[in-house]
Curated annotation (Swiss-Prot):
Belongs to the PROTOR family. The keyword Iron does not apply. It comes from Bos taurus. The modification Phosphoserine is found at residue 28. Keywords: Phosphoprotein, Signal transduction inhibitor, Ubl conjugation. GO terms for cellular component: TORC2 complex. The gene is PRR5L. Residues 312-368 are annotated as: Disordered. This is Proline-rich protein 5-like. Pfam families: HbrB.
Length: 368
């Protein structure tokens, strides 16, 4: 019996999806027919930026001319500036405001002041400053409120522009001397506010010229003077209309203070610091800083103040300047006047008491 041969049939299994990700279909390069559409979109964006900037420029010039903002105009200007910050012009808004808009707006202010002569120019300058400080400056800050995080703020840029483009071009040196008895308070306010604005690169020539004007109307005056012999600026304290004759007074007090070396470039107007820490307590022997044992130092300060102002009842003299000099015993930091003297050993107080007075001289020079 022969076995029949049964042909095998192919078995079909259910097909599963491929685990391999399909190849991405790359877009073909844009056709030449799409270029007009791209150019039209870019031109529309540029037109939108130009329209936004033109609205800002028109509003700023109108503010300098004495006008104000319309209803809801401030919101629209802020939105336009936010849109400009996101565009290609975003990094140039501050520079364009400083070099173009501010210069053009302050030109109207300068021309208004130069139309007057003599003492009338002082009065017009006071009125212009009042309007600029109370109306124009706050409006400019509100318009450019979205512009933040710059090296100089809109307020500082505007005040520096008023100083350089208006005040220093009016030439008030002679006018301030003539109008000294009846000088408007707005002029003094203007000079002090402009003096408080500093450039990030240090005192400029315009700042030094401004200080010469402040020096004529403010007494006592504390300012910065450039000394060619020193590496940095020098702080000068000047007093006008002094009633004492120019003289140099040397106050000498014997005090057991050990001189400590101090670098020359360190400013004399460093802030007061108090000694703290365990090492200080061990050195002073757990003695409180404020004791009666060191009351002579307070007496020295009172004597200094009395001798400096002892000539107030004398006849009037010329201009008086008091230079803030470094004492001959400069410590590494300024200590409080009632701080006890600290010695390194028990034998040093007697030695310090019999030492030379040259190491403990306190120099106060009153020069003219």
């Amino acid at each position: 019996m022969t076995r029949g041969f049964t042909p095998s049939l192919p078995v079909e299994f259910p097909k599963m999806g491929s685990f391999r990700r399909p190849r991405p279909r790359f877009m073909s390069s844009p056709a030449l027919s799409d270029l007009p559409r791209f150019q039209a979109a870019r031109q529309a964006l540029q037109l939108s930026s130009n329209s936004a900037w033109n609205s800002v420029q028109t509003a700023v010039i109108n503010v300098f001319k004495g006008g104000g903002l319309q209803s809801n105009e401030l919101y629209a200007l802020n939105e336009n500036i936010r849109r400009l910050l996101k565009s290609e012009l975003g990094s140039f808004i501050t520079d364009y405001f400083q070099n173009q808009l501010l210069a053009k707006g302050l030109l109207f202010v300068e021309e208004k002041i130069k139309l007057c002569e003599g003492e009338n120019r002082i009065e017009v300058l006071a009125e212009v400053w009042d309007h600029f400080f109370t109306e124009t400056l706050p409006t400019l800050q509100a318009i450019f409120y979205p512009v933040q995080g710059q090296e100089l703020t809109i307020r500082q840029i505007s005040l520096l522009g008023f100083r350089d483009l208006v005040l220093l071009k009016v030439k008030l040196e002679d006018l301030l001397l003539l109008a000294q008895p009846q000088l408007p308070s707005s002029i003094v306010q203007m000079l002090l506010i402009l003096q408080s604005v500093h450039e990030p690169t240090g005192p400029s020539e315009g700042y030094l010229q401004l200080e010469e004007l402040v020096k004529q109307v403010v007494s006592p005056f504390l300012g910065i003077s450039e000394d060619r012999g020193l590496s940095g600026p020098t702080y000068t304290l000047a007093r006008r209309h002094s009633r004492v004759r120019p003289k140099v007074t040397l106050l000498n007090y014997a005090s057991p203070i050990t001189p400590v070396s101090r670098p020359l470039n360190e400013m004399a107007l460093t802030p007061l610091t108090e000694q703290e820490g365990e090492a200080y307590l061990e050195k002073c022997g757990s003695v409180r800083r404020h004791t009666v044992a060191n009351a002579h130092s307070d007496i020295q300060l009172l004597a200094m103040a009395t001798m400096m102002h002892s000539g107030l009842g004398e006849e009037s003299g010329g201009e008086d300047k008091c230079l803030l000099l470094q004492p001959s015993f400069p410590p590494p930091h300024r200590q409080c006047s009632s701080e006890p003297n600290i010695t390194d050993g028990p034998d040093e107080p007697e030695q310090g008491a019999t030492g030379s007075q040259e190491d403990s001289e306190l120099n106060c020079a009153s020069l003219s």
